[in-house]
Curated annotation (Swiss-Prot):
Its EC number is 2.1.1.-. This is Secondary metabolism regulator LAE1. Signal peptide: none annotated. It is an enzyme of class 2 (transferase). The keyword Nucleus applies. The gene is LAE1.
């Protein structure tokens, strides 16, 4: 492992840059609060995050959010913003008069940002979100499983609740369930993708940063926090564009690209550091899984889960 000195931050194209960090397992990781975010922050990873933004847009009728916004000049937070692409999309194309705070451990957002976009480096596992934007109309979170300690999810939901405007503030939370599913048994008996998912989930469990999606548990946590009008939606994302449905094929094309970028990035640390794999063993498994997900006769899919909830007003 080589620690990068401050003067040697890795420059990126498109106005992005990487903060001081370190190379490990052949990838570049952030050095602010190391060990909290287990995935790389190099250019390949930034591309992966942007690809999944496209996946989620396609899966939701090209709408970056569905919650109603009832105030002019709304206040919005994007928790775990990554590259900031969701927040920038909202600022440029949906709500040009909004204040949008884009929160992440790593400052990997572009240098050129729209008015109203406020990047904020912050650890959302902190007990209080005091420095963050309050009285929000919308708090958006996605792909945070694996970035939050398993036992801290009630605290994260509580802090989101506290930072929403009573009566009109909404939370939207999106996650991918990485367990491969198939409704017609059209997948190989000894699936490399299934094996990858089992090992990845196990390794992340051992980090106490679970990525397993438990829909009812999340609903119960939202209810216990005090949210109302809770809605759950499940969207199929096929890993290969075999479907006769045009929209399903388009989602699958982008999901396949995103998945191809995800396999190695997400599983290097859990498989090497918790399950004892060598880096080349991980890459070989990922390559087999990648080839499998490109076979049209295999009808495997992953579920995308969406939770939407509202903070009630004082009289509700």
């Amino acid at each position: 492992m080589v620690v990068m000195p401050p003067q040697n931050s890795v420059n990126e194209s498109e106005g992005r840059y990487l903060q001081d960090g370190f190379w490990q397992h052949g990838r570049f990781y952030g050095s602010w609060k190391p060990g909290k975010y287990l995935f790389p922050i190099d250019s390949e990873e930034l591309n992966r995050l942007d690809i999944f933004h496209k996946v989620f847009l396609l899966a939701r009728d090209n709408k970056p959010f569905l919650a109603p916004i009832r105030r002019t000049s709304p206040r919005i937070m994007d928790i775990g913003t990554g590259t900031g692409i969701w927040a920038i999309n909202v600022a440029e194309e949906c709500l040009s008069d909004a204040q949008i705070m884009a929160v992440d451990l790593n400052q990997i957002q572009p240098a050129l940002i729209p008015p109203g976009f406020m990047p904020k480096q912050y650890d959302i596992e902190e007990p209080s979100w005091g420095p963050l934007l309050a009285d929000c109309d919308l708090i958006h979170m996605r792909m945070l499983l694996g970035s939050i300690q398993t036992d801290l999810w009630p605290q994260v939901y509580h802090n989101a609740f506290e930072h929403l405007a009573p009566g009109i503030g909404f939370l939207e939370h999106i996650e991918v369930d990485w367990i491969p599913r198939c409704d017609d048994d059209e997948r190989p008996a000894n699936s490399a993708f299934v094996k990858w998912a089992e090992l990845f989930l196990d390794g992340m469990d051992r980090f106490n940063r679970r990525v397993r999606v438990t829909p009812q548990e999340h609903r119960q946590m939202l209810e216990a926090t005090g949210f109302t009008d809770i809605r759950q939606e499940v969207i199929k994302a096929y890993v290969c564009p075999w479907s006769a449905d045009r929209n399903e094929r388009e989602i699958a094309r982008w999901f396949n690209i995103g998945l191809s970028h995800s396999l190695e990035a997400m599983s290097l640390k859990p498989l090497i550091e918790k399950l004892g794999f060598e880096a080349e063993e991980v890459r070989e498994l990922c390559e087999r899984a990648k080839r499998e997900t490109c076979v049209l006769r295999y009808h495997t899919y992953c579920n995308i889960h969406v939770w939407t909830a509202r903070k009630p007003g004082p009289q509700q």
